[in-house]
């Protein structure tokens, strides 16, 4: 999956393209302190976007930030959280590498005043940094897809996007429904790119397909002629794939040069604009449109919650990475918006910004209960809570249904080469056929 997952080499062009300010919404950075445990004062509260903003996965950070900025702006417009009238979205660049991410996380925890929540980590650095945030008692909504967090004991870890293994099953189901009898799996050899590899292989086999080749290719090589020749010799009817943009572009360009470009299905790591642009340039836009689809978590693009999200992000269009329209239907940006709203409403419900106090309310506010008022954004929820109502938050990604490990499994969509147009949608029950 986008294991939130892709390699950890440098791709400077994309990093430059997606450069964003280190602190948004025009608010100054807060002072330093030794731990993050909410605030009893009235100063700004900080939500951190802890994701790659540089390196091959540099698109992950802006994608999460595109959810944080509109949520924070709307919270500020609604009067803030308790005595805190300003909410800050702060970026922290993990660089997509655990070696860089650990000191970055430690610095974030040690120096950010009133840090009350984190968007992230991604799969690139989650295993190394989730324990740090958990020990510091900071709620985090991970965009990691790693299966290791399917049943984790981290009390401050939440996830409302499906794990990588589920993405692999969705890819397998779609390939089977399209009638592809054989498949090759071509994935980058970094850990993060391979989150969906085991399940797309096992799932495709279970529902009757044949895997004719599995390749774990080294990243960012100048040529993959040997690997491509082996692929062609295996005669797959479809390719399952994830690697970083540069690697995928080089590999698929050589497949095209040898006259064997055919259908390929990517993880949600491939549905990002940098990947689609790089591969589209390499194989041609028409070929990308004709042969490619990608699997990603489903997010509805109709209904009242979506319209709330759309209105709020359009209100801050100039503050997110451009073009802003790329985030309108992005399931991870929508999930980030929901995550900020849930944490903010949990503070209001708990009457505290101390994570140890408000953390249990995150699950409570997402869970249906008799007589609960259904709300779709922070302002609605705050108003209802202040009038003594019980609420259920149903946001842009739909109903959040946390399991005992604080994961919320969801549906999947298969999207076209624009990264958003849906060509198929599967519920979690439907993809279970491949498990």
Q: Which residues fall in each region the model found?
A:
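Extracytosolic ligand-binding ectodomains
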Residues: 2-9, 13-435
């Amino acid at each position: 999956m986008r294991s939130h997952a892709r390699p950890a080499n440098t791709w400077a062009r994309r990093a430059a393209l997606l450069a964003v300010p280190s602190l948004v919404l025009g608010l100054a950075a807060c002072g330093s302190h030794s731990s993050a445990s909410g605030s009893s004062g009235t100063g700004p509260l900080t939500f951190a976007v802890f994701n790659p903003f540089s390196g091959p996965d540099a698109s992950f950070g802006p994608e999460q930030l595109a959810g944080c900025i509109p949520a924070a702006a709307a919270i500020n417009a609604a009067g803030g959280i308790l005595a805190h009238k300003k909410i800050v979205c702060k970026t922290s660049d993990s660089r997509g590498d655990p070696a860089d991410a650990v000191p970055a996380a430690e610095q974030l925890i040690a120096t950010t005043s009133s840090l009350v929540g984190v968007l992230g980590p991604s799969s690139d650095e989650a295993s190394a940094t989730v324990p740090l945030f958990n020990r510091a008692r900071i709620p985090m909504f991970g965009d990691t897809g790693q299966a290791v967090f399917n049943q984790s004991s981290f009390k401050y870890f939440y996830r409302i996007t499906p794990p990588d293994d589920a993405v692999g099953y969705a890819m397998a189901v779609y390939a089977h429904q399209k009638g592809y009898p054989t498949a090759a799996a071509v994935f980058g050899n970094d850990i993060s790119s391979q989150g969906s590899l085991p399940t797309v292989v096992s799932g495709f086999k279970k529902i009757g397909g044949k895997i004719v080749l599995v390749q774990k290719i080294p990243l960012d090589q100048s040529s993959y002629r040997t690997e491509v020749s082996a692929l062609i010799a295996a005669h797959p009817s479809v390719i399952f794939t994830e690697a970083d943009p540069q690697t995928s572009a080089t590999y698929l360009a050589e497949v095209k040069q040898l006259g064997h470009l055919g259908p390929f299905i990517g993880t949600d790591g491939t549905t990002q604009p940098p990947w689609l642009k790089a591969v589209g340039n390499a194989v041609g836009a028409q070929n990308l449109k004709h042969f490619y689809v990608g699997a990603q978590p489903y997010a509805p693009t109709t209904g009242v919650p979506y319209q709330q999200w759309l209105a709020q992000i359009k209100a801050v269009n100039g503050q997110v990475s451009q073009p802003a329209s790329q985030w309108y239907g992005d399931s991870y940006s929508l999930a980030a918006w929901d995550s900020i709203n849930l944490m903010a409403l949990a503070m209001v419900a708990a009457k505290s910004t101390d994570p140890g106090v408000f953390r249990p309310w995150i699950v409570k506010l997402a869970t249906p209960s008799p007589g609960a008022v259904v709300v779709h954004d922070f302002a609605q929820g705050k108003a209802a809570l202040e009038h003594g109502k019980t609420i259920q938050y149903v946001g842009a990604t739909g109903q959040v249904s946390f399991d005992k490990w604080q994961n919320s499994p969801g549906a999947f969509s298969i999207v076209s080469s624009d990264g958003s147009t849906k060509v198929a949608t599967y519920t979690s029950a439907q993809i279970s056929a491949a498990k």
